[in-house]
Amino acid sequence: MQTFSTWKVVCLTTFLLFGGIWALALVLPSGDNSKLQALAHAPIALFIGVGVAVYVLEGLVWTVGAIELGARLARSPRLGAAVGVGGYGLLSHWSGGSSSVIAATWIALVLNCSYLTLRQRCKRIAILSTVGHKLAYFLMAAYVVYTYGA
C-alpha cells in the first residue's frame, strides 16, 4: 500500500475541500440568499467570534469525536467517520435544503477521510489539520458573506 506524506494529504484535502465546494456551487441551485444578507449586516467581531467557535466545535464533534468514539466503542474508526458524515451532513444541515445537505456531506466526507489517513501517523496532526481546514473554510465563507452579501 502506497503511503503519502503528511503534506501531500493536507494539500490534497485542501484541494478537494475547496475545489469540491467550488464545483458544487456551479452545479447546485443557489440557496436562500436572505440568510446571507442578514449575516452581512452582523457586526464582524460577533460574526467571527461565534463562527470560529461553531466551526471548531463542528470539527471536533463530527470528525474527531465521531471517529475516536467509533474507534473506542465499536473498534471501527471508519464506522465513526460514517456516523460523523451522516451527522454533520444530514442532522446538522437538513433544514437548509438539498444543496446544504450535499455541500455539508462533501465537507464532512473530505475532512473525515483526511482525518482517518492522518490519524494513522499522528492524532495531533490529524486534529490540527481538521480544525485548520474548518477555520480556513470559515474564513472563506466570511469573505463571501461580507463581500457579496451586502
Predicted features along the sequence, with ranges:
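Juxtamembrane helix-loop-helix connectors linking adjacent transmembrane helices
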Residues: M1-A74, A82-V83
